[in-house]
Amino acid sequence: MGAIMQANENMGSKLPKTDGKVIYLAGGCFWGLEAYMERIYGVVDASSGYANGKTQSTNYQKLHESDHAESVKVVYDPKKISLDKLLRYYFKVVDPVSVNKQGNDVGRQYRTGIYYVDNADKKVIDNALKELQKSVKGKIAIEVEPLKNYVRAEIYHQDYLKKNPNGYCHIDLKKADEVIVDSDKYTKPSDEVLKKKLTQLQYEVTQNKRTEKPFENEYYNKEEEGIYVDITTGEPLFSMADKYDSGCGWPSFSKPISKDVVKYEDDESLNMRRTEVLSRIGKAHLGHVFNDGPKELGGLRYCINSASLRFIPLKDMEKEGYGEFIPYIKKGELKKYIHDKTH
């Protein structure tokens, strides 16, 4: 009999559930954490259980005796998502300094924890927590231990929020839709390399803050689904899902693909007061952001030079190493379809 393939389109992986790497995460009530993890690209499967108690067996009614933590077994494809990135998604939805309490749930069974089965994961976990500690006040209370005495939870608890869409959930599931772009994947080439790699216009725009002509640039009216990356480094910047026609003659976006991939500087050139937008790693001049965008899209207009961007079509994103961002492009298609049908 062949392996049963994971069918959830949000997971981005066709790895059999029995393959991949495994990590066990505790973060309060497991109903919400399980549903949240299932939304993350690269996760193959998530299931609820009880971890690191005193006994080899337990059930929901006996947790106060066995001291198990409500946990989620996460099977993930390391080719799609790293453990470090998975943990950063986990950190988004837990209070890391709270002891035995998450959301409205109080008790030892609701403690936070990361339980590993591969000893090599311990270093990754420790480094991730060290980075997290820099951004939070108070001592981190997330326990880190090798997995022991794990018990799969009762059928009633598995996929609880799928079976009960309006059921209790202390987690904001939308945080799984927030894009994390790894900065260490991208580097800025030397000026010598950039001069060879870029056209004269691309170099002048990105390095010397020039502006290309409106309506005479490559992407201002492009409607194909895909992703726009920094022409100098390849770092993802904008999704077609957030592109709209502002009539200004340059590509316009309601927001970057992640708030972390752009930087801002005051620009008082040309006797105007504007906010310049630069790429995070390449520090390339991209354009400017204005507050005259559509209110229903957040009210911002990122007016970006085509010369600062490289477009990668949806069909090529996987082979060019941007497969992890495909779900956000597809969500954009759905959003656009719904908008068109209701307006």
UniProtKB/Swiss-Prot annotation:
Q: Which GO terms describe its cellular component?
A: cytoplasm
What does the UniProt keyword field contain?
Answer: Multifunctional enzyme, Oxidoreductase
Reactions it catalyzes: L-methionyl-[protein] + [thioredoxin]-disulfide + H2O = L-methionyl-(S)-S-oxide-[protein] + [thioredoxin]-dithiol; [thioredoxin]-disulfide + L-methionine + H2O = L-methionine (S)-S-oxide + [thioredoxin]-dithiol; L-methionyl-[protein] + [thioredoxin]-disulfide + H2O = L-methionyl-(R)-S-oxide-[protein] + [thioredoxin]-dithiol
Q: What Pfam families does its record include?
A: PMSR (PF01625), SelR (PF01641)
Class of this enzyme: oxidoreductase
Residues forming the MsrB domain are 191-314
Supply the Gene3D superfamilies for this chain.
Peptide methionine sulfoxide reductase (2.170.150.20), Peptide methionine sulphoxide reductase MsrA (3.30.1060.10)
Single GO biological process annotation from the record? protein repair
* Stretches the record annotates as Peptide methionine sulfoxide reductase A: 21-174
Catalytic residues, chain numbering? 29 (cysteine sulfenic acid (-soh) intermediate), 303 (nucleophile)
Q: GO molecular-function annotation terms?
A: L-methionine:thioredoxin-disulfide S-oxidoreductase activity; peptide-methionine (R)-S-oxide reductase activity; peptide-methionine (S)-S-oxide reductase activity
**PROSITE patterns from the xrefs?**
MSRB (PS51790)
Q: Which NCBIfam families match?
A: msrA (TIGR00401), peptide-methionine (R)-S-oxide reductase MsrB (TIGR00357)
Q: What is this protein called?
A: Peptide methionine sulfoxide reductase msrA/msrB
Species this chain originates from? Enterococcus faecalis
